Amino acid sequence: MKDFESIKFQINELVNKELEVLNLKVYEINNLKEFENDMIQILVEDALQANKPLDFDILIKANDLVSNKIDQIIKTNQKYLLEISSSGIEKQIRSQEELIKALDQWVYVQLNNEIKKVKEFEGYVTKYNNDTNTFSFLFFIKGQKKTLEVMWNNIKFIRYAVRF
């Protein structure tokens, strides 16, 4: 969509305001091409518990709340599709603030540098120490319980994970 970046912020503000009543917030907004049409994809998550599963009914309500409002911002004759979806159960944790909200959650972590011979793992985010600015993780290697203290700047990639 032409000039999408110029209206993305407005869409984000409007959608977040409308979704407050459903206790949802925007995770990400994308402009995609689908079958030669522009698609605005709005990924949402629960406002209080970022990794809470969302059911189809709440996504339908979210779509109903915002679809006409977005038309007021997008002043074009160009056709577009609107998709409101869950941000997903294994979404990326993009900031230190998001990781603080992920306490007691199961995550997959890749580190920039090895710590105690560990470069990647799946485990629980057990605590955040504000004084040292470190996160504690609990995980298992070959059945042995391990803990690791990691600073945010040593995390290369982190996302929620599903524990099997």
Curated annotation (Swiss-Prot):
Compartments, record wording: Cytoplasm
UniProt KW keywords: Cytoplasm, Ribosome biogenesis
Transmembrane regions: none
Highest taxon of source: Bacteria
GO biological process terms on file: ribosomal small subunit assembly; translation
Keyword Cytoplasm applies: yes
GO cellular component: cytosol
Pfam families found in the cross-reference section: RimP_N
Family stated for the protein in its record: Belongs to the RimP family.
NCBIfam families tied to this protein: PRK14643.1
PANTHER family: RIBOSOME MATURATION FACTOR RIMP
Role, per record: Required for maturation of 30S ribosomal subunits.
Classification via HAMAP family: RimP
Protein name: Ribosome maturation factor RimP
Organism: Mycoplasma capricolum subsp. capricolum (strain California kid / ATCC 27343 / NCTC 10154)
